[in-house]
């Protein structure tokens, strides 16, 4: 049984790509058709490839992999944070700082500073410092927390990276490739898929689409860590849905109200 049904993908708008003039020709094999100047993603492939991504992430988690969720645009930020936390993993959902992976030593020093400021508040140091200095420390902490809070407890560079919109997160993807870190990603029709190891063809601009795919990757981690019982409720929900016999053409027409 597919981990994500065609019905779920359609309802979340996963099939809507970019305007045809903005496409990347390397995504041609994942495009089903064009409607009103918009490319429509082949959801039959998305169903199959989402299964492969789920299995990849699940197996990595079963081997105690450190998995980093990356999505810094506004449509992705909330889901990336929430699902990474739910799965007990790590995230970056604001601007990617160049060198986050390739200059991990420097990043660790900044994380150490963040933790030091937190300790200063906890042990009462703030109470004996001038208010102006405390204000500066709080400002510094807020900035560090914004960019590094999601990886503050990450024990090492990640073993796998899940990315929403690798076109936007090109720096993150390049750093991962340089270090040999496999990348699983939601790949829209405007993106070069060549640097992505495990591709999920999908609309990466709709909040519902991002939430759906990101949540499934979190489910994969939970299953890998704890066994199938932890996602039994999700599977039961899918099993309750009637099997669809519609073709993708018919589904697209239904969505467009034809």
UniProtKB/Swiss-Prot annotation:
InterPro entries: Ribosomal_uS2, Ribosomal_uS2_bac/mit/plastid, Ribosomal_uS2_CS, Ribosomal_uS2_flav_dom_sf. It comes from the Bacteria. GO terms for molecular function: structural constituent of ribosome. One of its GO terms (biological process) is translation. GO terms for cellular component: cytosolic small ribosomal subunit. Coiled coil: none annotated. The keyword Flavoprotein does not apply. SUPFAM superfamilies: Ribosomal protein S2 (SSF52313). It holds the Pfam family Ribosomal_S2. Keywords: Ribonucleoprotein, Ribosomal protein. NCBIfam families: rpsB_bact (TIGR01011). Belongs to the universal ribosomal protein uS2 family. This is Small ribosomal subunit protein uS2. It comes from Streptococcus suis (strain 98HAH33). The lineage of its organism: Bacteria, Bacillati, Bacillota, Bacilli, Lactobacillales.
């Amino acid at each position: 049984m597919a981990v994500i049904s065609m019905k779920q993908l359609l309802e979340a708008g996963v099939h809507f790509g970019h305007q045809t003039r903005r496409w990347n020709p390397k995504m041609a094999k994942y495009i089903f058709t064009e409607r009103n100047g918009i490319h429509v993603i082949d959801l039959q492939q998305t169903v199959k490839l989402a299964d492969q991504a789920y299995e990849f992430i699940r197996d990595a988690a079963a081997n105690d992999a450190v998995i980093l969720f990356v999505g810094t645009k506004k449509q992705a930020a909330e889901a990336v944070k929430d699902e990474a936390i739910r799965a007990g993993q790590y995230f970056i959902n604001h601007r990617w700082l160049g060198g986050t992976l390739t200059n991990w030593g420097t990043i660790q020093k900044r994380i150490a500073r963040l933790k030091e400021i937190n300790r200063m508040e906890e042990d009462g140091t703030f109470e004996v410092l001038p208010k102006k200095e405390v204000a500066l420390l709080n400002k510094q902490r807020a900035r560090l927390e914004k960019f590094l809070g999601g990886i503050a407890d990450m024990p090492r560079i990640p073993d796998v990276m899940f990315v929403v919109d690798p076109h936007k997160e090109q720096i993150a993807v390049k750093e991962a490739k340089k270090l040999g870190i496999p990348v699983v990603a939601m790949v829209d029709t405007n993106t070069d898929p060549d640097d992505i190891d495990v591709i999920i063809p999908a609309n990466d601009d709709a909040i519902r689409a991002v939430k759906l795919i990101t949540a499934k990757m979190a489910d994969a981690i939970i299953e890998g860590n704890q066994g199938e019982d932890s996602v039994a409720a999700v599977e039961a929900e899918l099993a309750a849905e009637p099997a669809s016999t519609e073709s993708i053409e018919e589904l697209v027409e239904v969505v467009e109200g034809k």
